[in-house]
Design a protein with these regions (language model features):
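Flexible, glycine-/basic-rich loop-and-beta segments that form/coincide
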Residues: 106-153
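A short glycine-rich, Lys/Arg-flanked "PGG" loop and its adjoining helix->strand segment in the class I
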Residues: 38-55
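Conserved S-adenosyl-L-methionine
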Residues: 95-106
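A conserved beta-strand element that flanks and buttresses the S-adenosyl-L-methionine
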Residues: 23-26
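Conserved SAM-binding strand-loop segment of SAM-dependent methyltransferases
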Residues: 1-14
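Short, glycine-/aromatic-enriched active-site segment of Class I SAM-dependent methyltransferases
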Residues: 56-79, 83-85
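Hydrophobic adenine-recognition pocket in adenosine-nucleotide-binding enzymes
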Residues: 30
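A short, well-structured juxtamembrane/interface segment
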Residues: 153-171
Length: 180
């Protein structure tokens, strides 16, 4: 059944009333585009069965910075995630982040598994490992070496591109660009 509506807690209640609780809820490359994440989390919590899981895939901000994936940063993406804030966000909504898989999609993403608080799954070691790495990188500090280096590498890319375009113009060549 396809429901032509935006997902929220009210829709989740209707789904549960008609079909029962869900053992699996998925969302791929959408979570970062949602304005009201709290409402989505409330809906997911209402929809999940006691042993159910919510699996979503989204950009991983650490990979974005380390891999220079700034071309994916644009207006549709309202959030860029790291693991610690995700853990706190789901805890606030009575859920727990129990597993994370790093995947190469879109320059570096994470596939996260969330369950209701106290659910049957044990927390995978990778969750704590990624949180420890984020803390070591000082990802929450805009003046951390990670971001200073990121800024420097972006400026270097700008210099290289500007130089290349000047060289091409000097050779009488024309350049064209297109973007979405």
């Amino acid at each position: 059944t396809t429901l032509p509506a935006f997902f929220d807690s009210t829709l989740a209640e209707g789904i549960v009333a008609e079909h029962g609780k869900a053992s699996l809820v998925t969302m791929n490359n959408l979570f970062a585009n949602i304005d009201d994440l709290d409402e989505i989390a409330k809906g997911i919590r209402k929809l999940l069965a006691p042993d159910g899981v919510y699996i979503f895939e989204s950009f991983y901000f650490v990979d974005y910075v380390e891999n220079m994936v700034f071309d994916f940063m644009y207006h549709e993406h309202l959030s860029y995630f790291t693991i610690r804030p995700l853990e706190k966000f789901f805890a606030k909504h009575g859920m727990e982040l129990v597993d994370v898989e790093r995947i190469p999609t879109k320059g570096g993403s994470v596939r996260c598994m969330v369950q209701l608080q106290g659910g049957p799954k044990s927390r995978a070691p990778i969750v704590d490992s990624l949180i420890a790495r984020e803390e070591k990188l000082a990802i929450q500090n805009a003046s951390s070496p990670l971001f200073v280096d990121f800024k420097s590498r972006i400026e270097d890319q700008k210099r290289k591109l500007t130089s290349r375009l000047r060289d091409l113009k000097g050779q009488g060549k024309t350049s064209a660009g297109d973007g979405a």
